[in-house]
Amino acid sequence: MAKVSELDVQLIAATAFHAPQGVDWEVDEGASESEALVEFAGRACYESFDKPNPRTASNQAYLHHILEVGHDALLEHATATLYIRGLSRSASHELVRHRHFSFSQLSQRFVHSEEAEVVLPKFIAEDEQLTRLTLQAADEARFVYEELLDALESKLEEEPNALLRKKQARQAARAVLPNLTESRIVVTGNYRAWRHFIGARATEQADTEMRQLAVTCLKLLREQSPVLFDDFHITTLADGTEMASSPYA
């Protein structure tokens, strides 16, 4: 029986900020490096390192002002990289439509799908009979995949390059793998792009799996740079899932 995978998202890299020499400006204690960089970039536009406006003197107040007035281009200077596992292949195709991100995704051409897990949609996972039926379909697809793989490798046996032979066989056989096959992907984006993704995909109208991913990303990014994401409000829907919204997204 196919093994079910659960969503797992980890922050693996984020912006490091090094204040330049010769600039009379100090980073607020407690500000993340991403938050410090965004503030520095904004103050660099106007040479306001002396913080002349008391209403935006602190890092938190300055960044909140940036979001309020829509000067979010400054957020493009800070980036975060997340490693996502337990995402269905179908959901990954929605994710890669966000073209301001950079992606490195698990290759079905090079990696044998023998051990690949599956991701069940919420409404299927909640029903024992539907779960059994879906896992049965996944097992049958895996069986056909293995049969095709063996047949294709035999068909390509005259190819002297073993690596090329396996790659050609897998790239053809993967056509029968279902959309619920788990994918793994590294995603890097600037904070403006992450905010756009969360604003678009954490809504009640979004696909359930994508909404779960967006809310999970929000929670991680808010831990890393709380001021840049604390305008998002997370609420629980009637079905027990979560959504997020912001007046600025």
Swiss-Prot record:
Binding site residues for FAD: R97, H98, R99, Q105, N190, Y191, R192, H196
Domain ThyX intervals: 7-235
Listed cofactors: FAD
Cofactor binding note of this UniProt entry: Binds 4 FAD per tetramer. Each FAD binding site is formed by three monomers.
Residues annotated as binding dUMP: E94, L95, V96, R97, Q105, L106, S107, Q108, R109, R174, R201
Active site, UniProt feature: R201
EC number: 2.1.1.148
Pfam family, one: Thy1
Stated role: Catalyzes the reductive methylation of 2'-deoxyuridine-5'-monophosphate (dUMP) to 2'-deoxythymidine-5'-monophosphate (dTMP) while utilizing 5,10-methylenetetrahydrofolate (mTHF) as the methyl donor, and NADPH and FADH(2) as the reductant.
Protein name according to UniProt: Flavin-dependent thymidylate synthase
Organism expressing this protein natively: Corynebacterium aurimucosum (strain ATCC 700975 / DSM 44827 / CIP 107346 / CN-1) (Corynebacterium nigricans)
